[in-house]
C-alpha cells in the first residue's frame, strides 16, 4: 500500500484514493477485483492511465487490459 499511496498520493487527493478501491492497482495485473470496477471507474481510466504510466505499465497496456477484462467482468 505504501507504493500505491506514494504513487497516487501526489496526483489525487486522499478522498479520491479512498473512493477508489485498492483493486484498481491489482486490476492492471489481471486480478479478480476487475469486475468490481463500475462505470465511474471505467470513465476515470484516463486518470488511471497516467498512474499506470508511472508504474511502468504504460497507457496502452492499461487500456488494453481494462477493455478486455472489464467487459468480460460486466457480462459475468
Curated annotation (Swiss-Prot):
<comment type="function">
    <text>Plays a role in viral replication.</text>
</comment>
<protein>
    <recommendedName>
        <fullName>uORF2 protein</fullName>
    </recommendedName>
</protein>
Amino acid at each position: 500500500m505504501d507504493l500505491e499511496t506514494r504513487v497516487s498520493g501526489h496526483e489525487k487527493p486522499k478522498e479520491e484514493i479512498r473512493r477508489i478501491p485498492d483493486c484498481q492497482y491489482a486490476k492492471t495485473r489481471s486480478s479478480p477485483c476487475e469486475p468490481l470496477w463500475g462505470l465511474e471507474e471505467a470513465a476515470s481510466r484516463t486518470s488511471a492511465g497516467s498512474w499506470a504510466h508511472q508504474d511502468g505499465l504504460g497507457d496502452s497496456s492499461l487500456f488494453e487490459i481494462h477493455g478486455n477484462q472489464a467487459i468480460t467482468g460486466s457480462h459475468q
